Amino acid sequence: MIFQNFAPLAIDTSTNVAMVAIENPLLTAFSKVIAVSFDTISLVVISVIISAYFFYRNQSKKELFFASMMVVTGAVIYFLKELFQRVRPMNQLMAETNFGFPSGHATASTVFVFLLAYLYTKDKSNETRKKVYWAAGVVALIVGFTRIYLRAHWLTDVLAGFVAAALILVGAIFVEKRF
């Protein structure tokens, strides 16, 4: 589309080489488990369960907010991938066939864990909020690292996914506070 043939940057290729250098079976197995745990199907299933829980608890505002933001996230990811049409690294440890920029795993998992953190901690103490947000950040970073380690993405794909997630979250919280 507009940004077709968006080539990897020097930092992308050097990071890719570094991931080859640290490759080992245990880290590969762990990374594949994380990849499957935070793929589209897994996040959709978990999101439906969480939305059903909110519905069951008569928290329809949370249900609608959470479900709609996950749908918006999916749409943003699809739009950006089609806009940039960036090819993934050739030496993948886990084959992916669609475009790579931004990382859908990094974007969706970051929105997912931080939305849950936001909804869970709204009525909690500052200490609890800090712990929950730190945990969400660690999960997001692990997902991002595994995408780079598996060479399913360039470093900048993952960083762009984090930026997209941050923008989605800021927009989501802005809208949620007004309604």
Regions found by a protein language model. Name each.
Residues 90-179:
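Membrane-embedded catalytic cores of phosphoryl/pyrophosphoryl-handling enzymes
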Residues 10, 46-47, 56-126:
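Membrane-interface loops
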Residues 17, 65-70, 158-162:
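Alpha-helical transmembrane segments of multi-pass membrane proteins, especially transporters
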Residues 43-46, 50, 70, 132, ...:
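Hydrophobic alpha-helical transmembrane segments of polytopic
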